[in-house]
């Protein structure tokens, strides 16, 4: 009979790991401290709660995270199944109804006979047995100290932020218009057009706005992919125009012209009663968010369902600690998964949980752990977090830069080249699944 496995943390990585274990017949003891003990960012006790955006980014195979998603679908990922079941309109991206998404994951795992859920905090790394630690970037202090001592290095960190969510019925639809950039796919976003004068006034007030105090925060500590909008604005007068306020491909049907700047709103739930402000992660004080963001055309009377906020994310110096199976080098049977390993992003975190879960299951069944092929997105992420120089280690999203170049004549068109890399990755994964995993 296979050994039981303990999974600590029911976020994206822990939930995916639990699913991969349980569907292989392994009994899982899943520990989650919420809702009994809260974190600075979570609001519910549900599994796989999305604390920042509701977007899982591109769904296209010309994008590395699109490849990662498709690889996970090929391996029967619970997180991808939940995302596909609860998606909301978002053009070429995959966005979800965050409440329905978490409920799907929670109900699925709690409904499995070989998953026992324990609502309690774990404060020590278990000394024996097969364990996956997937407690995320908001790991409780007691366990974080244990992990720091185990890894033999100081915890590394960066700051992450969430964007505000506003009520749909408070948006002025006489000003705002529905459109996706370059009219790709369905018209999935609401767009708030700005003139040059409106943009400059907004940018000026944004830079002057008062931020919430957060211990240890420095502007240099932010993750580039989730930068607070006020930090971006302070980098230069036009910086936002090349980021979330980029107007290209978003002509205003009211005027037939491209606005100077455009703020986009993305549907946040299936009922379309809430929208988040795309790219507006922030740590402004709540009153300042209301004052400054209400300067956006169409949001003058916006009702804020949730204000944006920032939290500290910690991660390990994984190259010193982990193998490509996410198993600890000096402690067989102990695995780590999720953002604490240095992968960055919802899908990347779930992907690491998938790899760790499959390998923990193999160990429980008396098989050898395996490294995924480096020409797959899953394998390239594992390779990055375990072989990069620990001295310069930083969190990383899925990227084609992590994958080996194609052999033969170079394909000049980037989209076509990336699609070929994805095609190669999926073929490699399917062969690996047949020859090694099945």
From Swiss-Prot:
Catalytic activity: uridine(54) in tRNA + (6R)-5,10-methylene-5,6,7,8-tetrahydrofolate + NADH + H(+) = 5-methyluridine(54) in tRNA + (6S)-5,6,7,8-tetrahydrofolate + NAD(+); uridine(54) in tRNA + (6R)-5,10-methylene-5,6,7,8-tetrahydrofolate + NADPH + H(+) = 5-methyluridine(54) in tRNA + (6S)-5,6,7,8-tetrahydrofolate + NADP(+)
Necessary cofactors: FAD
Signal peptide coordinates: none
GO biological process: tRNA methylation; tRNA wobble uridine modification
Keyword Disulfide bond: no
Gene Ontology CC entries for this record: cytosol
Gene Ontology terms for molecular function: flavin adenine dinucleotide binding; tRNA (uracil(54)-C5)-methyltransferase activity, 5,10-methylenetetrahydrofolate-dependent
EC code(s) of this entry: 2.1.1.74
Source superkingdom: Bacteria
Binding residues for FAD: 9-14
PROSITE patterns assigned to the protein according to its UniProt record, in alphabetical order: GIDA_2
Annotated compartments: Cytoplasm
Sequence similarity: Belongs to the MnmG family. TrmFO subfamily.
Physiological role: Catalyzes the folate-dependent formation of 5-methyl-uridine at position 54 (M-5-U54) in all tRNAs.
NCBIfam families membership: gid_trmFO (TIGR00137), PRK05335.1 (NF003739)
Protein name: Methylenetetrahydrofolate--tRNA-(uracil-5-)-methyltransferase TrmFO
Top-level taxonomy: Bacteria, Bacillati, Bacillota, Bacilli, Lactobacillales
């Amino acid at each position: 009979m296979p050994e039981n496995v303990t999974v600590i943390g029911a976020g994206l990585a822990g939930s995916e790991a639990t699913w991969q274990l349980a569907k292989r017949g392994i009994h899982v003891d899943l520990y989650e401290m919420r809702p009994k003990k809260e974190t600075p960012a979570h609001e519910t006790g549900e599994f796989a709660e999305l604390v920042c955006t509701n977007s899982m980014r591109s769904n296209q195979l010309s994008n590395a995270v699109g490849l990662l998603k498709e690889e996970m679908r090929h391996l029967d990922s619970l997180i991808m199944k939940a995302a596909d079941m609860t998606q909301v309109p978002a053009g070429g991206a995959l966005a979800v109804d965050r409440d329905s998404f978490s409920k799907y994951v929670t109900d699925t795992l709690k409904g499995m006979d070989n998953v026992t859920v324990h609502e309690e905090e774990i404060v020590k790394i278990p000394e024996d047995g097969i364990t996956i630690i997937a407690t995320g970037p908001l790991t409780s202090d007691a366990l974080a100290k244990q992990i720091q001592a185990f890894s033999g290095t100081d915890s590394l960190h960066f700051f992450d932020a969430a964007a505000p969510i506003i009520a749909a019925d408070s948006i002025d639809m006489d000003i705002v218009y529905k459109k996706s950039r370059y009219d790709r796919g369905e018209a999935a976003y609401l767009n708030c057009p700005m003139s040059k004068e409106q943009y400059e006034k907004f940018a000026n007030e944004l830079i002057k706005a008062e931020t919430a105090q957060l211990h240890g925060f420095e502007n240099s500590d932010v993750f580039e992919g989730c930068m607070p909008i006020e930090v971006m604005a302070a980098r230069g007068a036009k910086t936002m125009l090349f980021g979330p306020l980029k107007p290209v491909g978003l002509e205003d049907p009211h005027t037939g012209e491209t606005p100077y700047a455009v703020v986009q709103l993305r549907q946040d739930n299936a009922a379309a009663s809430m929208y988040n402000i795309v790219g507006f992660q922030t740590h402004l004080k709540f009153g300042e968010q209301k004052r400054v963001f209400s300067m956006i055309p169409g949001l003058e009377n916006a009702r804020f369902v949730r204000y944006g906020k920032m939290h500290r994310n910690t991660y390990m110096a994984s190259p010193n600690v982990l193998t490509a199976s996410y198993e600890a080098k000096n402690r067989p049977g102990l695995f780590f998964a999720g953002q604490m390993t240095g992968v960055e992003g919802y899908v990347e975190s779930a992907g690491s949980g998938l790899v760790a879960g499959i390998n923990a299951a193999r160990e429980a069944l008396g098989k050898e752990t395996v490294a995924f092929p480096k020409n797959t997105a899953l394998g390239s992420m594992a390779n990055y977090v375990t072989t990069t120089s620990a001295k310069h280690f930083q969190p990383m999203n899925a990227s084609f830069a992590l994958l080996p170049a194609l052999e033969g004549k170079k394909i000049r068109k980037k989209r076509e080249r990336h699609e070929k890399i994805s095609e190669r990755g999926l073929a490699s994964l399917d062969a690996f699944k047949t020859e090694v995993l099945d």
